[in-house]
């Protein structure tokens, strides 16, 4: 299926080809620059317009009529699930993540974080599994919020656009989908609840949500699958934020050889 504009949604991946024995988690400790819980505890003060605007409140969430809105992101369950630096998911994909200390690499057009960052990769892989978390808003719907570029040693690269609501959700909630007015034209995203460590693509039903508002207690990361050219040697991955007023972070990369 396609959207009303005839544009196919950006795929998040179906995770049907996961081979746990071939999965290699990438050590990202040197590029982590924050705790995922920091996202709405910061003050995003620049760049800002010097004039009266309807821009986001300084905490990075909310709107002009809800200036004090926030969301308490709690990663205690995720950290409690980590064993010897590894998070095992029910999809069979392990991610390297610390039980203590910084556990995400954030990017943003706000000055709090770099616009982009680079993560070294090695060897060859058929796909990359990404554990990501960040913010997005109504104004960033149906546009590229950010982009993942995986470069090979020959200078070429593969790209994965991060588009709300195709494959880029807000950390504080899951999407309401009814197949009608609220139709993503794509399978539901796999989300990892940070407060419990649970993974599912059906939290709407499992958590008993009945209305449109579906805020997740503690927040949730998202799992994405990115196909790669298995015949080429990898060089590095670049995460870049493209849209104003969002924060995009990567918590884990696992390569399937």
Where are these regions (language model features)?
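N-terminal/edge-of-domain interface segments
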Residues: 1-257
């Amino acid at each position: 299926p396609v959207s009303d504009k005839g544009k196919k949604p950006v795929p998040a991946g179906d995770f049907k080809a996961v081979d746990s024995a071939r999965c290699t988690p990438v050590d990202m400790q040197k590029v982590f620059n924050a705790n995922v819980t920091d996202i709405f505890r910061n003050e995003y003060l620049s760049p800002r317009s010097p004039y009266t605007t309807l821009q986001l409140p300084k905490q990075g969430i909310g709107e002009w009529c809800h200036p004090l809105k926030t969301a308490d992101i709690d990663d205690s369950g995720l950290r409690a699930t980590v064993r010897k630096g590894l998070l095992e998911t029910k999809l069979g994909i392990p991610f390297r993540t610390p039980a203590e200390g910084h556990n995400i690499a954030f990017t943003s057009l706000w000055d709090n974080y770099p616009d982009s960052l680079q993560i070294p990769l090695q060897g060859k892989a058929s796909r990359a599994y990404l554990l990501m978390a960040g913010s997005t808003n109504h104004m960033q719907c149906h546009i590229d919020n950010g982009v993942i570029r995986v470069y090979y040693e020959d200078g070429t690269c593969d790209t994965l656009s991060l588009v709300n609501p195709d494959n880029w959700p807000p950390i504080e909630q899951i999407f309401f989908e009814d197949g009608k007015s609220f139709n993503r034209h794509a399978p539901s995203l796999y989300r990892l609840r940070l407060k419990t460590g649970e993974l599912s693509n059906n939290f709407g039903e499992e958590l008993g949500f009945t209305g449109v508002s579906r805020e997740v207690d503690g927040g949730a990361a998202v799992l994405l699958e990115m196909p790669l050219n298995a015949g080429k040697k990898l060089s590095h991955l670049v995460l870049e934020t493209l849209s104003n007023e969002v924060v995009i972070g990567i918590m884990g990369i696992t390569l399937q050889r």
